[in-house]
């Protein structure tokens, strides 16, 4: 499937699954909850995401390093306008 047809949440899901070998992964678009706030997308989609994630790569690293791994995996999306990414490591 062409990534141009995927939502931002779907693209990030695909990226995190590929890069971090996830065993559990949910990417939830919460942009609609932030309508009218600074950084909110005018379309109401893709500016605020929540990630619930588990990966075997997280077992030997600190909480800060886990978050760094996630942020490093999606940095290009942040550079393109993703405003907020909440991370919940399971």
Located regions from the model:
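Contiguous, often N-terminal, cationic amphipathic patches that form binding interfaces
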Residues: 2-64, 71-72, 79-90
């Amino acid at each position: 499937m062409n990534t141009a047809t995927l939502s931002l949440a779907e693209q990030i899901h695909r990226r995190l699954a590929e890069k971090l070998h996830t065993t559990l992964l949910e990417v939830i678009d919460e942009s609609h909850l932030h309508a009218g706030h600074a950084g909110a997308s005018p379309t109401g989609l893709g500016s605020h995401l929540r990630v619930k994630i588990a990966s075997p790569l997280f077992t030997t690293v600190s909480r800060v390093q886990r978050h760094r791994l996630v942020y490093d995996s999606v940095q290009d999306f942040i550079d393109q306008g993703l405003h907020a990414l909440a991370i919940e490591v399971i």
